[in-house]
A protein has these predicted regions:
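C-terminal substrate-binding subdomain of Rossmann-fold SDR/epimerase-dehydratase oxidoreductases
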Residues: 2-107
C-alpha cells in the first residue's frame, strides 16, 4: 500500500495550505512517496536490527480491506498544482527517519 514518512505528510499539508488558490484545480489531492511490500520492509528492518524476529499472520478480514484499496495513488495533480515532492523515498524513510527514531526511543 502507498506509504510516506510523517515529515512528508506534514510538509504536504503545510504546502497545500499555503498554495495560492488560483493554482489549485481541485479540492482534494492524493500524495504518496513509496509502495513497499511486507518482504521489502522486513529486509530493511532485519538489516538494521539483525536480532529482530519478524513474523506475521494474515487476518482475512483486514486483508480484504487492504485488498479493496488501490495498489498505488496518482499524485500527479499535487506535484503539478503545488509542487508536492516527498523528501523521503523508501530507503531514506527507513535509514534517515524510521530506524534512527526507533533506535533513539529504545536505546
Amino acid at each position: 500500500i502507498p506509504l510516506m514518512a510523517m515529515p512528508d505528510a506534514v510538509d504536504a499539508l503545510l504546502t497545500l495550505a499555503s498554495a495560492p488558490r488560483d493554482r489549485l484545480r481541485r479540492t482534494a489531492y492524493n500524495v504518496a512517496a513509496f509502495n513497499p511490500s511486507a518482504d521489502e520492509i522486513r529486509a530493511v528492518v532485519l538489516d538494521a536490527f539483525p536480532q529482530a524476529q519478524i513474523t506475521w499472520k494474515i487476518d482475512s478480514k483486514r486483508q480484504a480491506i487492504v485488498d479493496s484499496w488501490p495498489s498505488d495513488v496518482d499524485d500527479g495533480a499535487a506535484r503539478h498544482d503545488w509542487q508536492f515532492q516527498p523528501r523521503y523515498d523508501f530507503e531514506r524513510a527507513f535509514s534517515e527517519y524510521l530506524i534512527p527514531t526507533i533506535r533513539k526511543r529504545y536505546a
